[in-house]
Amino acid sequence: MNHFAKRIIPCLDVKDGRVVKGVNFVGLVDAGDPVEIAKRYNDEGADELCFLDITASHLGRDTIVDVVKKVASKLFIPLTVGGGIRTIDDISRLLNAGCDKVSLNSSAIKDPNLIDEAAKKFGSQCVVVAIDAKKIENGYSVFINGGRIDTKKDAFSWAKEVESRGAGEILLTSMDNDGVKQGFSLELTKIFSALSIPTIASGGAGKMEHFKDAFEVGADACLAASIFHFGEIEIKKLKEYLKANGVEVRL
């Protein structure tokens, strides 16, 4: 699907209220402070921000709500939070704390009705479903639990089901490309561009050209982590490059 301006979304891993795999910006007082980092991305021209809560314990659920409250008060761009969201109550607490969207992953596979319920109660615009796809012999399969469990579901069929249940957006990660910095999976992104809801491409960004390539095959947004966090690519420069190459972005 092709919508309006293309979006650039940095993603931060948060554990026990701290950003892990620290962010290496010049002049950060505290490389683990989600509020400081969020504010920096806001100022750098990110279109949205994504937090992945990797806190394992249930106690940690309260921590992410506190983080969201603090960050949302300083942030002027949409914030999505994913990781460990299992119930309507979890979603409600995060949205009330000030996040704009929630990202469902394993929980959507285990209980697909959660998508319908969340979309009905909060609106499709709040519901993102994350799909981690890995190439298999004859297509792509959906994996959960950090890529450890093969659900044996076809990724595109699942995406169509998710769309029909009311999800407003799909966060598509190519497990084969993730962390390799050789580019997003263009084949996978192109397949998903046939959906009528937006697709965020994730996994594999290494240089500016990779973003351009993903947008050209139909991604609506691109998400990346380390290349932004370690200053390998500055968002402002990336957007200028994209604009110069005919990709519509908000400068």
UniProtKB/Swiss-Prot annotation:
Gene3D superfamilies: Aldolase class I. Signal peptide: none annotated. GO terms for biological process: L-histidine biosynthetic process. NCBIfam families: hisF (TIGR00735). Its EC number is 4.3.2.10. GO terms for cellular component: cytoplasm. It comes from Campylobacter concisus (strain 13826). InterPro entries: Aldolase_TIM, His_biosynth, HisF, IGPS_HisA/HisF, RibuloseP-bd_barrel. Its main location: cytoplasm. Heterodimer of HisH and HisF. It is found in: Cytoplasm. SUPFAM superfamilies: Ribulose-phoshate binding barrel. IGPS catalyzes the conversion of PRFAR and glutamine to IGP, AICAR and glutamate. The HisF subunit catalyzes the cyclization activity that produces IGP and AICAR from PRFAR using the ammonia provided by the HisH subunit. GO terms for molecular function: imidazoleglycerol-phosphate synthase activity; lyase activity. The active site is at D13, D132. The gene is hisF. Keywords: Amino-acid biosynthesis, Cytoplasm, Histidine biosynthesis, Lyase. PANTHER family: IMIDAZOLE GLYCEROL PHOSPHATE SYNTHASE HISHF, IMIDAZOLE GLYCEROL PHOSPHATE SYNTHASE SUBUNIT HISF/H IGP SYNTHASE SUBUNIT HISF/H. It catalyses: 5-[(5-phospho-1-deoxy-D-ribulos-1-ylimino)methylamino]-1-(5-phospho-beta-D-ribosyl)imidazole-4-carboxamide + L-glutamine = D-erythro-1-(imidazol-4-yl)glycerol 3-phosphate + 5-amino-1-(5-phospho-beta-D-ribosyl)imidazole-4-carboxamide + L-glutamate + H(+). Pathway: Amino-acid biosynthesis; L-histidine biosynthesis; L-histidine from 5-phospho-alpha-D-ribose 1-diphosphate: step 5/9. This is Imidazole glycerol phosphate synthase subunit HisF. Belongs to the HisA/HisF family.
